[in-house]
Regions:
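Acyl-donor-binding surface of acyltransferase catalytic domains
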Residues: 2-3, 15, 20-27, 35-108
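A structural signal for short, well-ordered beta-strand segments and their strand-loop junctions
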Residues: 59, 151, 207-211
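A conserved beta-strand-loop-helix scaffold within acyl/acetyltransferase catalytic domains
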Residues: 62-69, 83-85, 92-185, 225
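Active-site/acyl-donor-binding loops of N-acyltransferases
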Residues: 65-66, 75-82, 207-240
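Conserved acetyl-CoA-binding loop-helix of GNAT-fold acetyltransferases
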Residues: 185-197
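Conserved acyl-CoA
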Residues: 194-206
Length: 240
């Protein structure tokens, strides 16, 4: 996928400077090299939704998209929320009674403690496992668009999960989530996705953007479990 193809996919944004990163080790697939196209959203926040609709993702003040020359494994995926049909496993998962609180994007120590615990349990050797409080705060607080936090608690009041969410004109985007993995039977990560799908549906929006589906990465290939969904390939969204 070339820069030219990226520029064609956002032809209406031709006045926006699309920058290209240096090559680096791919964070998702071993022995792969990654290159990204990115846009500074702090200078052009109005472009975010159009970029998201062409497969870009947001991190802090930047929108980015992989444009690797020899790999197309990062496939943008969004759930068609109004038609979502949970399977039996998902129905059982969602039968739990968790409390959802909608919060502004402000970092706090309780969430950071859960984040660190999650990284230690699920991504022990990942780049984010050593994230400092300052960097975590940037991830949560730095957003040039409308964003929010979904916080999930059990009935006893313990925080079980947190999801950072961007608000788009056609739905929501799950930017990043983390949760308590101590009791695997709870499937908090799955619960948060189902609940956010239902939130999108209840608010008469269309999609929940889940980011990149990567078949070769078991930590990224769960996203096609939520049907129906669309994937972005060759410059268009196709139902799968």
């Amino acid at each position: 996928q070339s820069l030219m193809s990226i520029q064609k996919s956002i032809i209406k944004l031709s006045h926006i400077p699309v920058q290209i990163s240096n090559q680096s080790n791919c964070p998702y697939i071993d022995n792969k090299i990654e290159t990204r196209a990115f846009v500074n959203l702090s200078e052009h926040p109005e472009t975010h939704d159009q970029l998201a609709e062409t497969g870009f993702r947001r991190v802090e003040n930047w929108a980015y998209k992989p444009i690797c020359s020899d790999c197309n494994e990062c496939i943008p995926l969004r759930v068609i929320c109004k038609s979502f049909k949970p399977n039996q496993n998902q129905k059982r998962c969602y039968s739990q009674k968790l409390i959802r609180n909608i919060l502004p994007c402000q970092s706090n120590k309780q969430h950071y403690d859960l984040f660190k615990k999650y990284q230690k349990q699920r991504h022990k050797n990942g780049l984010m496992s050593k994230m400092s409080w300052a960097n975590y705060s940037n991830m949560i607080n730095l957003t040039p668009i409308n964003s929010m936090i979904f916080e999930y608690k059990c009935l006893k009041g313990n925080i079980l999960g947190v999801m950072l969410i961007d608000i788009q004109r056609d739905g929501l985007s799950a930017v990043y989530s983390f949760y308590d993995t101590t009791d695997k039977k709870l499937s908090i990560g799955k619960y948060m996705i189902i609940d956010t799908i239902n939130f999108v549906k209840d608010n008469k929006l269309n999609y929940l953007y889940l980011g990149y589906f990567i078949k070769e990465n078991h930590k990224m290939n769960y996203k096609n479990q939520f049907h129906p969904y669309e994937i972005y390939i060759n410059g268009k969204w196709s139902k799968n």
